[in-house]
């Protein structure tokens, strides 16, 4: 069990270095009062209570949030280990189930975003409830309370108590299993009814975002999730959060294999006929969703597939043991060695795939290809730059991203599409990552206002101006007109002379006497070979700001036009 926990931490270690995802920032905005937080029953524990306690305690430091998420994941590994060992009566089976589950690459988004903490919370409460149920006696009476906490962490576990009706190694009759599970089954039914009612009439789980359909999309969604699980070549499962039309061949083949295992290993102590329904019951609530096919939805269902793998290994181990008349046959040792090798190989492959996902950049940029990681990294860069500039004080900030230099990338694939055009319907990655600035205000209380500018706009003279490099890094330019002058100089230095001229001309319309703006504006004419216009603008600088140090430099150069 300890080895499985250590392996889990090693493979999932990169999650500790992450920042906040967009959904994290949205919830933090609710906590600090920048968004209206409507009262809600669903996700009461994982959203309202957790963030209500964590935000005042941890503030904008992302590490403690991720430590809690990873700690919950390790807890689930240990709970799954105990549950499988108790059902399968095999430590080898438990190692396989816990090892495969803990070190999976599928948990990238469940552990990378704090907002998805409902997934590990729900699984922890569910496994805890089932372990108490298995113990019997007074412990069984507490189990429904834990399951209620599971549903209030993530409602998708609502159907899982049905697996308690499946036969176990104890040989209890169906009537006895039904009697023991009745409290949790009734609770499950009540929650399911409430969920259906709230999904129809509630804003939180209703509306277009949670639109449902009950046709061929159910099968297509199931095949999509199945392919994400079984395709070892894909380092980016769930990169496009939508049904994958290519998933059917692989998904269907994997489903046939699963059904075959259910039949072949039906006499196992922990038969696949237990884990397979877990997989399906945990997925059923999300399969009808038309617009949502998210990787983190696999967190709880994948525990069922891990049980299938563990149960099959335990069954093979028992078959090998049954062939010996005395002692432990060599076949058992071989099964155990093979099981450990499978877990280690799976962990190594997952580690490689996660490394690819964390390090791959969009072509021609230093920005992450993965859309969730991309937004998180961009938000971190903005937070670092603004926090350093304000240094604990207050101020207004604006991010300058000239529209003439924008390039449109697909938010799904990260591929460059074309240069941006006016009214194209695109949005800046920076504005999207910061929820139009509200996320930055939630992280830094000293930010009184945040804006995103594509050109000089009147009314921003007292704003601290920032810009963004092709690596996603944000950097301070200066306040108001000074910031635009420096932005113009940067554009000229990178060869973007005409965009610089357009930018500076707009700023000069409000600040015609600002010497740095005028000087950089004159430089744009120099680099396009229009010496007459350059001399004219330098002469205007001398006339409007004769006492500025730049005016002295112009006089010494003798380049200004004389009246």
What is each stretch, according to the model?
Residues 482, 516, 550-553:
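Start-of-helix register in tetratricopeptide repeats
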Residues 1-482, 486-487:
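Polytopic membrane enzymes that build or remodel cell-surface glycoconjugates and lipids
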Residues 493, 527, 557-561:
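Register position in tetratricopeptide repeats
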């Amino acid at each position: 069990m300890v080895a499985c926990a250590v392996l889990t931490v090693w493979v999932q270690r990169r999650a500790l270095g992450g920042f906040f995802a967009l959904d994290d920032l949205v919830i933090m905005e609710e906590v600090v009062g920048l968004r209206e937080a409507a009262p809600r029953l669903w996700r009461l524990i994982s959203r309202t209570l957790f963030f209500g306690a964590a935000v005042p305690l941890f503030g904008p430091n992302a590490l403690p949030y991720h430590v809690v998420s990873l700690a919950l994941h390790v807890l689930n590994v240990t709970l799954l280990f105990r549950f499988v060992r108790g059902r399968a009566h095999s430590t080898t089976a438990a190692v396989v189930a816990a090892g495969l589950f803990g070190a999976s690459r599928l948990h990238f988004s469940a552990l990378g975003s704090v907002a998805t903490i409902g997934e590990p919370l729900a699984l922890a409460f569910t496994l805890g409830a089932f372990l108490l149920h298995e113990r019997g006696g007074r412990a069984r009476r507490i189990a429904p309370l834990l399951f209620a906490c599971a549903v209030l962490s993530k409602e998708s576990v609502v159907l899982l108590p049905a697996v308690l009706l499946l036969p176990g190694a104890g040989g209890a009759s169906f009537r006895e299993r039904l009697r023991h599970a009745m409290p949790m089954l009734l609770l499950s039914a009540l929650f399911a009814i409430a969920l259906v009612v709230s999904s129809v009439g509630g804003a939180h789980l209703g509306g277009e975002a949670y639109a449902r359909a009950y046709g061929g999309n159910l099968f297509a969604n199931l095949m999509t999730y199945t392919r994400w699980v079984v395709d070892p070549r894909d380092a980016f499962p769930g990169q496009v959060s939508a049904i994958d039309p290519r998933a059917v061949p692989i998904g269907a083949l994997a489903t046939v294999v699963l059904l075959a295992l259910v039949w072949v290993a039906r006499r196992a102590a922990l038969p696949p006929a237990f884990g397979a329904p877990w997989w399906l019951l945990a997925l059923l609530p999300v399969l009808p969703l038309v617009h949502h096919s998210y990787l983190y939805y696999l967190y709880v269902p994948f525990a069922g597939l891990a049980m299938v793998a563990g149960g099959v290994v335990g069954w093979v181990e028992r078959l090998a043991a049954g062939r010996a008349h005395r002692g432990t046959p060599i076949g058992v040792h071989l099964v155990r060695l093979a099981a450990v090798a499978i877990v280690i190989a799976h962990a190594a492959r997952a580690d490689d795939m996660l490394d690819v996902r964390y390090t791959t950049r969009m072509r021609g940029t230093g920005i992450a290809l993965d859309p969730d990681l991309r937004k998180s990294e961009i938000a971190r860069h903005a937070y670092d730059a603004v926090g350093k500039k304000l240094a604990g004080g207050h101020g207004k900030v604006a991010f300058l991203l000239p529209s003439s230099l924008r390039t449109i990338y697909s938010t799904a694939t990260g591929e460059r599409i074309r240069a941006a055009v006016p009214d194209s319907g695109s949005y800046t990655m920076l504005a999207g990552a910061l929820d139009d600035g509200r996320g930055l205000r939630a992280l830094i209380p000293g930010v009184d206002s945040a804006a995103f500018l594509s050109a000089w706009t009147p009314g921003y003279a007292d704003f601290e101006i920032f810009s963004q490099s092709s690596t996603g890094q944000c950097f301070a330019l200066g306040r108001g007109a000074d910031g635009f002058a420096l932005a113009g100089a940067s554009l000229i230095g990178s060869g973007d002379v005409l965009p610089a001229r357009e930018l500076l001309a707009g700023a000069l319309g409000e600040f015609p006497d600002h010497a740095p703006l005028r000087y950089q504006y004159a430089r744009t004419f120099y680099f396009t070979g229009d010496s007459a216009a350059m001399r004219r603008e330098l002469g205007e600088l001398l006339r409007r700001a004769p006492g500025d140090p730049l005016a002295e430099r112009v006089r010494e150069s003798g380049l200004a036009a004389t009246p």
